[in-house]
């Protein structure tokens, strides 16, 4: 597994130096360039700086081609280090570029959003969008991931909530994270660390997502469908939150799971507990999900806190869960994180 480090940006030069790279290049976006690039690059000799526009639409093959060209022009080699500094879009495309340029270069990731720190930057998944989200990608472990808590200080409230959707997922998967999250009063380094370490533990056992790693898709089958139906106006973490509630209702019917625990947790984190779409709309999207097998919908189902199963679910069960969690108010029953449940 990649080297996971927790600390300030000031330790980045030493992490890079350990790899003895031929050159160092930073890949970031326009927002993070303004906020953090100068500080991150301090102490690194004449780094190449590659800045892409903000936004999911720039996670594309066209962007990757432009980065490959720039690296080639700069004399970047397999012994050079590409550092992805930014949120999930940046870390995904940095990993994809590093894994494909000259069949693989050195790679470091410095995630600057909560979503990336607890999930997107960990585990070696890379990708670009191509007629769908992450349809072209690789598995490629970075040489290091630096989680610098300071970078969250400039993160807007909506991006904190976006990341909390993944925190809620880990809380249902791991009792230690659940204990921290149900007493949530604000983002702590301990909470981020426990989420990240849980994912590392799972990925180490199943890098290629052939078995155990599939539990990390909890909330994502319905979540991705909701995200897509909203034309991505509903952010990923909020869609995952809605998906967690759907999965919990499935678990309640099939295994007697207490879905009230999920609802209480989501409210504590200021996350939505309902979705705005018709059940059949979501079912249709779930049938197209890349996690479906021959159109059959595979679901991660909570049995109890810290225990899930992965199995095909009858569509009648899914439909009942989707209908039970529909919320037409537009609010999804949200409140500010840390509020009483």
UniProtKB/Swiss-Prot annotation:
The keyword Aminoacyl-tRNA synthetase does not apply. NAD(+) binds at residues 54-59, 88-92, 112-113, 125, 133, 151-154. Its EC number is 4.2.3.4. InterPro entries: Dehydroquinate_synthase, DHQ_synth_AroB, DHQ_synth_fam, DHQS/DOIS_N, DHQS_C. This is 3-dehydroquinate synthase. Disulfide bonds: none annotated. GO terms for cellular component: cytoplasm. CDD domains: DHQS. GO terms for molecular function: 3-dehydroquinate synthase activity; metal ion binding; nucleotide binding. Pfam families: DHQ_synthase (PF01761), DHQS_C (PF24621). Pathway: Metabolic intermediate biosynthesis; chorismate biosynthesis; chorismate from D-erythrose 4-phosphate and phosphoenolpyruvate: step 2/7. Catalyzes the conversion of 3-deoxy-D-arabino-heptulosonate 7-phosphate (DAHP) to dehydroquinate (DHQ). Its cofactor is NAD(+); Co(2+); Zn(2+). GO terms for biological process: amino acid biosynthetic process; aromatic amino acid family biosynthetic process; chorismate biosynthetic process. Binds 1 divalent metal cation per subunit. Can use either Co(2+) or Zn(2+). PANTHER family: 3-DEHYDROQUINATE SYNTHASE.
């Amino acid at each position: 597994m990649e080297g996971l480090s927790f600390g300030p940006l000031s330790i980045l030069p030493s992490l890079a130096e350990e790899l003895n790279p031929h050159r160092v290049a930073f890949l970031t976006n326009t927002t993070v360039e303004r906020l953090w690039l100068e500080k991150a690059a301090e102490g690194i000799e004449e780094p190449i700086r590659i800045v892409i526009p903000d936004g999911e639409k720039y996670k594309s093959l066209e962007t990757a081609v432009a980065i490959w060209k720039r690296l080639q022009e700069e004399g970047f080699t397999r012994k050079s280090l590409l550092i992805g500094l930014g949120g999930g879009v940046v870390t995904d495309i940095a990993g994809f570029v590093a894994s494909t340029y000259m069949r693989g270069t050195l790679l470091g990731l410095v995630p600057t959003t909560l979503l990336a720190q607890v999930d997107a930057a960990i585990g070696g998944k890379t990708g670009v969008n191509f007629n769908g989200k992450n349809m072209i990608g690789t598995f490629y472990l970075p040489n290091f991931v630096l989680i610098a808590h300071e970078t969250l200080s400039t993160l807007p409230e909506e991006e904190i909530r976006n990341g909390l959707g993944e925190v809620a997922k880990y809380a249902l998967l791991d009792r230690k994270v659940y204990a921290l999250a149900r007493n949530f009063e604000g983002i702590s380094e301990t909470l981020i660390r426990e989420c990240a370490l849980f994912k590392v533990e799972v990925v180490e056992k199943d890098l290629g997502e052939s078995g155990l790693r599939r539990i990390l898709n909890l909330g994502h089958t319905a979540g991705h469908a909701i995200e897509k139906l909203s034309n991505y106006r509903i952010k990923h973490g909020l869609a995952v939150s809605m998906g967690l509630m759907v999965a919990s209702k499935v678990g309640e019917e099939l295994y007697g799971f207490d879905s009230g625990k999920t609802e209480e947790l989501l409210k504590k984190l200021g996350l939505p507990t309902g979705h705005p779409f018709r059940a059949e709309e979501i079912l249709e999207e779930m049938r197209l999900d890349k996690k479906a097998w021959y159109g059959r919908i595979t679901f991660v189902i909570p049995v109890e806190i810290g225990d899930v199963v992965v199995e095909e679910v009858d569509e009648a069960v899914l439909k009942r869960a989707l209908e039970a969690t529909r919320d037409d108010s537009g609010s999804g029953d949200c409140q500010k994180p840390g509020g009483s449940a």
